[in-house]
Structures are given as structure tokens and as C-alpha cells.
Amino acid sequence: VGTHSVHLLADFDINAGAPGSGTTGLPQYAKFGRTIPTQMWDGFLSSNYHSLQVAVNRSFSKGLMLKGAYTYSKAIDYTDADGWASVGFNWGPSFERNRAAAGFDRTQVLQMGWVYELPMGKGKLIAKSGIAEKVLGNWQVNGIFAAYTGTPFTISGPTASLNAPGNSQTANQVKASVDKLGKYGPGQLYYDPTAFAAVTAAATFGNSGRNILRA
């Protein structure tokens, strides 16, 4: 299953500055002295979704019903609608840095549901009659199971060294790969934090991309 969406609405700051330009370098500063964001709401974005979907459907037979679905997919967009959609990189030459795995993307999703009729009661294997049949007969158990991969997130920077109002900054990835430590709980590390460092060079966005790690 695949979809391609076009003309998606979002905010675009037309008063965003170039790296290192600061407030006085904003496009609308020279003409109007305007130093605050100027949001343009327009249908200028697109997104893609591709997936492999498999379903299992076992009708009720011999006391068991089973339904399940598995999806392997990828969603790509420029921003996520989290109440008010806006892109992080508004300066024209940097715009394609917004394109990445969607913030809601889950690579794998597995869902299962089942109903099992216990083999007790009239016409069943045990407890076919009498008190046992009345107490234990005609019972069912059911369950739902779901497992899925985490959603992506960005390692952001403080933007001070970038000095480009209206734009985001990402951290520098200083190691070839980011080790997954896999620990959970307060104070525990899931990823190696030493794989990233703050951007110190002036007028630089950072070499890591949007949504490169997963929760």
C-alpha cells in the first residue's frame, strides 16, 4: 500500500534569515524594520507512505478465533501536524533538510487478537454435565497483543552559533555511528550521548538530520 500527498498546508517563515545574518539580515528588516517571524500559510508540502501489509483472519473454529495484522512501512514528510504544522528549516537553500522520516513513523507494527472457548461444558472435553457443567461451562478467554517500533526524533542544537532567526539547528554527530545502549528508566541511557556535540562553528546548521534516531 502506498500514498503520495501534495499541496499539504503548513507554515513557512518568509522572514527567516540566512546562517550568520542575525536579526539585521532578515529579509524584511531592511524594508520594514521587521524582526519577528512572518508566517505564510500555504499548501507547499508533500508526503509519501509505502508499506507491506499482511493480515491473518481465522474464523471461529474448534473453539478458536484469531485475527492479526503486520505492517512494514515508512512515512516521509517535511513536518508533522502537532496542532500547528510548521517547518524547522525556513531559509530557502536549507529547506530540503526538513524532509525525513515522519515523526509518527513506525517501521514495524504487529497486532494480534484472539478468542478461545475453553473446552468445558456440554459437548466439550470435560465438565460435560452436572454442577461442573453449570459452573465451568461456556467460558471464553480473549486477548489483544500489540508490538511496534519507536517513533523518530531529532537531536537539536541551541541555535546560538547558527545565528539565523527562523531556523532550527541540529547537533553535530561526532562518531561514525550512534551506539544503542538499550537501557531504560530514570537516569538510564538508551543511546550513547557522546556520539553528538554542540555546534561550535559559526553559521552552521549541524551535520545530523531531522528524525535520525528512534525512541
How would you label these PLM feature ranges?
Residues 1-215:
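Short, solvent-exposed micro-motifs at the edges of structured domains
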